[in-house]
Amino acid sequence: MKIVLRVEGLRQNYGGVQALRGVSFELQAGECVALIGPNGAGKSTCFACLAGQQKALAGSLVWRGYDLQQSTVEMRTRLGVARTFQVAQVFEALTVLQNLQLVLQASRGVSMRDLLAECLLDEARHWLFQAGLSDLGEEMLRSPAARLSYGGKKRLELAMAMAGLPDASQGLMLLDEPAAGLAPEERTDMMERVKRMAHLGATVLYTEHNMDAVFGVADRVLVLIDGQLVAQGSPQEVAANQEVRERYLGQTFSLSKEPVRA
């Protein structure tokens, strides 16, 4: 498989405290990779540097040949980089459809009048379907997003992230705890959709504290502790890594979940 993201020697400091200490890894096209570690390990900082919300102190970030260190958030979106957050970031005062329309307007460079065209309304509904919101009635689609459940807002944010990319099947999806706060059935469905995104060609990097959503879903696992990448490999390799068990997973951890199929 083709390597599409190279992260080399990534460093970031906060007031003299090293948040990232020379982190290096590569991602291949169509991979679904989990980034795990305890709170404060540097996962969110790594995501912020990749997404352009922060500029790394040192190191290189190369996505499909483009230097992300020299790219703004807007440029990264055009290059196919999207991020979601642990707490869903949606415009609650706007309707569900308006949230999607706003993203489409920004990413497609079209006027608000053009957004009312049936083809773009159909595209908005397409992304809602991909995120698992196809069962929303017309009344709910035209209601404020604040009326959605927590899980509904997480799905809407995922739909917005996919809709904002030039080609979601070629994009880099940075998903910060996509299943956090969801009921077990919702969590399973969400992670199946995350896996499906990679199956369709997107490169997915996500964080999670729920180990079922990690070891039952990811193709590979990266382990970040105290700002350093201490292990990476298949779920089986990482679960068997003695340092990871001692410093994070615990000695009694075992792989008990069947892998999620896309």
Predicted regions and their residues:
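Glycine-rich phosphate-binding loops of nucleotide-dependent enzymes
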Residues: 2-6, 10-262
